[in-house]
């Protein structure tokens, strides 16, 4: 099976490709619509600002392709900014329309006693079972780097969260769409297990 890692000039491709390959996935890094259509599943990585990300996706003609393939039932996993892009709108850079594959908004992490951006290790709090988190230790810590987060108001899609003064949705998903706010590829042995689980999920 071929997994398309979507390249839209939004960073962290090298680490994601390395982790995906280590997990046993056969990947192609591409922004070519036909290669994305021909792939069996998709990964949308990303770091940076939402407006730039959506401008790049749109500029490469990929927004409609991604939506179309998801509607057909193709699996999609978003990582960090790629997860945030799954939602309807982001406050980062104004009111930025995103892919709209999941309901909800991306908002700024609240300023207070905790530093923003949120950088560091946090424990995953499980909300419901999902195969992508199978076999993790009881206390599993993963690595976050972000200033914006998905409001937890639409809680049905939350698989796991982290506490950072607010409830930060950490793993989200519905049907053939999954998202990770943290970086599994930077999360040590726990992240490696998540990548192996993700590989199995993508290939089903």
Residue ranges and their predicted role:
Residues 88-164:
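Pocket-forming structural segment of enzyme catalytic cores
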Residues 180-204:
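Acyltransferase
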Residues 166-173:
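Short, surface-exposed beta-strand/loop micro-motifs that present aromatic residues
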Residues 27-38:
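Short acidic low-complexity segments
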Residues 43-45:
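Structural motif
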Residues 1-4:
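Extreme N-terminal starter segment of soluble prokaryotic enzymes
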Residues 48-121:
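Cysteine-nucleophile active-site neighborhood
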């Amino acid at each position: 099976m071929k997994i398309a890692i979507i390249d839209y000039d939004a960073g962290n491709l090298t680490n994601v490709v390395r982790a995906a390959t280590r997990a046993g996935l056969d990947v192609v890094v591409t922004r070519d619509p036909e290669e994305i259509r021909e792939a069996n599943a998709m990964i949308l990585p990303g770091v940076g600002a939402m407006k730039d990300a959506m401008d790049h996706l749109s500029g490469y003609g990929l927004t409609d392709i991604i939506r179309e393939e998801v509607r057909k039932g193709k699996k999609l996993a978003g990582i960090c900014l790629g997860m945030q892009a799954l939602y309807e709108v982001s406050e980062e850079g104004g009111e930025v329309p995103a892919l709209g594959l999941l309901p909800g908004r991306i908002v700024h992490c609240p300023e207070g006693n905790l530093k923003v951006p949120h950088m560091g290790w946090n424990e995953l709090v499980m909300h419901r079972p999902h195969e992508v988190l199978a076999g993790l230790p009881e206390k599993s810590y993963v690595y976050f780097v972000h200033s914006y987060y998905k409001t937890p108001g639409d809680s049905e899609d939350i698989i796991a969260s982290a506490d950072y003064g607010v409830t930060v949705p950490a793993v989200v998903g519905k049907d053939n769409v999954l998202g990770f706010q943290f970086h599994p590829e930077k999360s040590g042995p726990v992240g490696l297990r998540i990548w192996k689980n993700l590989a199995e999920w993508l290939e089903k």
